[in-house]
A protein has these predicted regions:
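Alpha-helical transmembrane segments and their immediate juxtamembrane cytosolic regions
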Residues: 1-334
């Protein structure tokens, strides 16, 4: 049996920081059917930011071989990390929507709440679907850890295509698995086969490489614009997802290499889970108070949601949540 030594990847933490910034941006602004700058930015980050989290998780998991007892321990550990916050924050959000339902963006349907929560559908806190989906994919990866990640990536991608064309499942456990498992396992495959090549690439780590990635990024934004406003092709959508995740990864490696803004991205990466879990409530509070009750202009409270949704969770977590074992367990799964 093989055992993997736990490694810490600064590049992946930086990538997590960039991805969580995209989450906060995506939750701050409204999408638009016709092109606007803020509307495009919101739709743009949605092209790749959640797939990036699955990629990151798969990368960090890598390829591990476990005994039966180790599989059980790993599943219990993942349940504590993901499902404890999932159920706790579901209850918290349901109670808040019960008390302040008149201000809720998405009113709660209590008649189907239990079933919805158990199958990962229509959670009161929309962002919690990620925890549920990741847990299911984690279990699958743990149970089938004897199969290499490249093979699993290919197999899951075939299932993804079949689901997109034939099964068309989405919005609950089966749809989540079929939609994102291939990206998760792709992260493990990239770690094994590509990571060192990118990190040690003289071209990509040179000034010329930075210029190349900048030019490619501009072209990517143009492609994403077409995907958002012009075409509903699943092939284009898939290409935009893969390119976006890979670009984010390469940019993170370049940032780590040149230490450009590294401390900021590392800070956001270190508090990535905290921002994802707590930021929702900060942003919703601003939306209700400033948007619904006080009637602030959309741009005013939207920017407040972005700024405070990013900063407030760091302070709340550092000085309150992480200092309390129970809160840390219930909210962060630590």
């Amino acid at each position: 049996m093989e055992k993997s030594k736990k490694q810490y990847f600064n590049e992946i933490n930086i990538m997590r920081g960039m991805a969580v910034l995209c989450v906060v941006i995506g939750h701050s602004f409204n999408p638009t059917k016709t092109p606007t700058i803020l509307g495009f930015i919101k739709s743009f980050v949605y092209c790749f930011h959640m797939p990036a989290f699955f990629f990151i998780s798969g990368f960090l998991e890598g390829e591990k071989r476990r005994s039966i007892s180790e599989k059980k321990q790993a599943i219990v550990k993942k349940a504590k990390r993901l499902m404890v916050p999932y159920f706790f924050l579901t209850v918290v959000t349901a109670v808040l929507k019960l008390l302040f339902g008149a201000f809720a963006r998405n009113p709660l349907n209590y008649s189907t709440l239990a079933v919805d929560v158990l199958i990962g559908r229509n959670n009161p806190n929309g962002g919690l679907w990620f925890l549920y989906a990741l847990f299911i994919i984690f279990i699958f990866g743990i149970l089938f850890d004897t199969i290499n990640r490249t093979t699993l990536t290919g197999t899951m991608f075939v299932l993804y295509m079949l689901n997109t064309i034939v099964f068309k499942q989405s919005g609950y456990v089966v749809g989540f698995f079929l939609s994102y498992a291939w990206i998760y396992f792709m992260g493990g495959a990239v770690r094994k086969h590509i990571y060192e090549k990118i990190k040690n690439s003289e071209l990509l780590m040179s000034v010329k490489g930075i210029v190349i990635i900048a030019v490619v990024s501009v072209g990517y934004m143009m492609l994403a614009f077409v995907r958002i406003y012009k075409s509903q092709s699943w092939i284009l959508a898939t290409a935009v997802t893969v390119i976006g995740v890979f670009l984010l990864f390469v940019i993170a490696v370049q940032i780590e290499h040149y230490h450009c803004g590294e401390k900021l991205w590392m800070l956001l990466g270190d508090y990535g889970m905290d921002i994802y879990m707590i930021g929702y409530y900060v942003q919703q509070a601003i939306f209700v108070v400033c948007g619904k009750i006080l009637g602030f202009d959309y741009l005013v409270y939207a920017w407040m949601m972005l700024i405070f949704g990013l900063i407030a969770p760091i302070f709340l977590s550092k000085y309150v949540v992480r200092k309390n074992h129970m809160l840390s367990t219930l909210i962060l799964g630590r």
